[in-house]
């Protein structure tokens, strides 16, 4: 390769890397309100487009959640809250297994919750000034038909210290925090039987099939 060709390829590489970095920066600086709308639009449009497939196999909701919702969820932050003070005493291998299983459990929980969706309208609150806040709650109204009171959900978002990316770490509905409820359900097993047993039992719960309530 001669000097001219080398300079040409160097210029192309510089352009590609610059474009990549600009894209990453744009993603990191994207408002959580914008991300919330993006996630909701993709999630519910895919649910609507795949109704026949979902009715035939409700577990397909897990695939939709995995593809459309989990990329917006900070599983490591939420999972570390479940482990609490045990985090530092676990091995890298144990943590890897735990976070994988924890992600599958959250996937199952969200997919099961979405069996209650039946073409309701989703209304996300108007964007507020973020300021220097690294944590924010975003209210989402699920508008019901026939004048039934809307279902209020609050999605808790956190801005990563290093990445600068906003991600969800908890959802609150009817005054119940999914994260706190998860901690409450599993902390006893973690305290008494250790993380390996916790992982095994979480795997059992995560493998539960998605079912529609009759």
Curated annotation (Swiss-Prot):
GO terms for cellular component: periplasmic space. Keywords: Periplasm, Signal. Its main location: periplasm. It is found in: Periplasm. Residues 1-28 form the signal peptide. Pfam families: MlaC. Involved in a phospholipid transport pathway that maintains lipid asymmetry in the outer membrane by retrograde trafficking of phospholipids from the outer membrane to the inner membrane. May transfer phospholipid across the periplasmic space and deliver it to the MlaFEDB complex at the inner membrane. Belongs to the MlaC/ttg2D family. This is Intermembrane phospholipid transport system binding protein MlaC. It comes from Haemophilus influenzae (strain ATCC 51907 / DSM 11121 / KW20 / Rd).
